[in-house]
Amino acid sequence: MAKKQASKKRSWFKRIMRWFFFAWLASMVYLVLCKWMMPPITTTQIGSLLSGDGLKRDYVDWNEIPANIRLAAMASEDQLFPDHDGFDWKSIEKSLSTNPKKKNKKRGAGASTISQQVAKNVFLWQGGGIFKYIRKVPEFYYTFMIELIWGKERILEVYLNVIEMGPGIYGAEAAAQAYFQKPAIALTDTEAALIIACLPNPKRYTVVPQSKFVGWKHRHILRQMHNIADDPDISTLCNAGLTANEKPRKQTHKKG
């Protein structure tokens, strides 16, 4: 009897391990395929469909994503993006060492990198509470793998195609059409900054009608765009794949 029970336990263990192996293998195949194809759908997009927001998206190629929206995304979300390995270790260390009662609650303190946001949006799920902590280990893994396999250009391309930029609106192209009735490639610097300003909570911080937060944040993003535009690594990433006519114009707004 004891031998049968031990045999059953080993059998269940083998089944579970086999299931985990095939799940891991399938996820790796999907990750490699997404180096060349856009994700067919994400959990956040499924959530939009189920909630009644609909699904407005228009995936575009890297050379159709303008320099100013690339620059605005990095200026707002991850200024170290061209240089890090997927993680902002200094911010992580600072976040872990800060007394939770005294943490700076401003947006950006301990924020995820663009690479982490892509890993979360494409392969995992959104949400806080206990699900946030359950997600951390696979998020670390997928972030490491896309940095290794995709590279910076592809990560930023996917980010600017799949990130939610309004209720049911996904990607810069769909946002440009929804808010300004024009393709993303025709966006002005101010319009690009306005679209990015709705992140990370586009349902609360709306572009149209323009929330007070978006009004403030887009001006901050424009200043940051001016400050980082001449960084050689950022400039290279902003200009990659674009013709001379599509490259960023000199920022003319005033600081302040």
Which role does the model predict for each range below?
Residues A2-G256:
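Juxtamembrane regions of bacterial inner-membrane/periplasmic proteins
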